[in-house]
Amino acid sequence: GMASKAGAIAGKIAKVALKAL
């Protein structure tokens, strides 16, 4: 549902942020 979708988006953002560091 909405929660899992938000979690997936947050995970993608976290991965991108880690790569940017």
Swiss-Prot record:
Entry function: Antimicrobial peptide.
Family in the record: Belongs to the gastrin/cholecystokinin family. Magainin subfamily.
Segments crossing the lipid bilayer: none
Gene Ontology terms: biological process: defense response
Protein keywords: Amidation, Amphibian defense peptide, Antimicrobial, Secreted
Tissue: Expressed by the skin glands.
Name the record gives this protein: Peptide PGLa-R2
